[in-house]
């Protein structure tokens, strides 16, 4: 009888647990179904084609502005997902319960397939150790020491374009040249390696840079790779997965494979060169590009000196190198191209910004780190562009257990009921509403969709400061927040400011007759109407006081 009693007790406990879990999930699902959202016209595809469409900017605006701070979207085959742009809910996701809310398995697996065990492919304690090792080399103090490297690269860029303009070439693809400069900046400043000499007589395009530039558009077309990478990574040993990819008859997949192979080979080559130089001593290090001040040289030294339990294996250091190059090239260069386009469209702001730069002590050349950050309009132009046009529009999180998201302000359900918090069942797909927070009219005002750098020259609206937006940068969500925020945002900010200071003190920028279209992908990129290749041509001339 005692044995039966224990059995009945165990069954009762199991049934109670299952019933509670079922009720929680039912409640969560009923709340989710009650959240407003745009109508869906396909049970099989939901809003996927609209949201992830390269020309889906209008739909992104509709989601961000028309349905409140939390929006219900339809996924594939009747599944539901959240779009969350409520600051308090985002604080819970990114900071308060960061160990519960993690990147989707497919995202982590894709990064592991492309780079290895890098910062955006690891979780928990593994991620903490990597971040602890990397944080010092992205500090303000280290950025200050890297500034001479930045000017060295950008002054070379200026000479190349100056020669072109003097030769009568007025239409310049600013995306190409900002991309080449970004690659060389992360090469010299990040890896202590020169990818591109940026010489006046060098007309050859950089194949490595071109490959990187084509990767995000290619990734956006390979839906199966992005969605099912966590299954692909489990398909047998590495050699088997490699053979499957080699045989896969898709040009975009082959393009991605080529980029990954190139990054991996170059990272191993650079890493081995650095190890040899460090073993030979300071004199050998000083002879390298960057003179040992680059991120990887310092990181390798720090890793060697770290305690055994904090030390990273060489494979992970190499993975960080590939990630650095990949992440730093497109995001910043595309944002720079966007800024130059906006300045070409807003000539009055271009003139004011040039005046501010020329009135600095260095007149646009070799401005100190402190003075560069005191140029208020330059800072405002960068912040406003990053607010209105975040280069990465879609980042996702999935709760590893049931969670509850509190809201800053209540929302109204489809049935009119007030919703103050949202129960979220384990495994629910959530989109971080970066764009939604950045353009929300309740925070930024009725002109939130207008590019107005001057909004940063006065105190921000009280609604913005009171909202406690959990972003790591300037009350916006562009670089995310919490321990998984973009680690290189200071590097990116300094790069944009140095490029703009040097280029605007020398050149003028105007629109061409060509229609520029921006495409949503992993990183947004521009094309010319009728052409799928990433590019952004502008008319450039010599500035004459």
UniProtKB/Swiss-Prot annotation:
Heme binds at residue 486. Pathway: Secondary metabolite biosynthesis. It comes from the Eukaryota. It is an enzyme of class 1 (oxidoreductase). Keywords: Heme, Iron, Metal-binding, Monooxygenase, Oxidoreductase, Signal. GO terms for molecular function: heme binding; iron ion binding; monooxygenase activity; oxidoreductase activity, acting on paired donors, with incorporation or reduction of molecular oxygen. Residues 1-14 form the signal peptide. Its EC number is 1.-.-.-. Its cofactor is heme. InterPro entries: Cyt_P450, Cyt_P450_E_grp-I, Cyt_P450_sf, Cytochrome_P450_monoxygenase. Cytochrome P450 monooxygenase that is able to use anthracene and pyrene as substrates for oxidation. Belongs to the cytochrome P450 family. This is Cytochrome P450 monooxygenase 212. It comes from Postia placenta (strain ATCC 44394 / Madison 698-R).
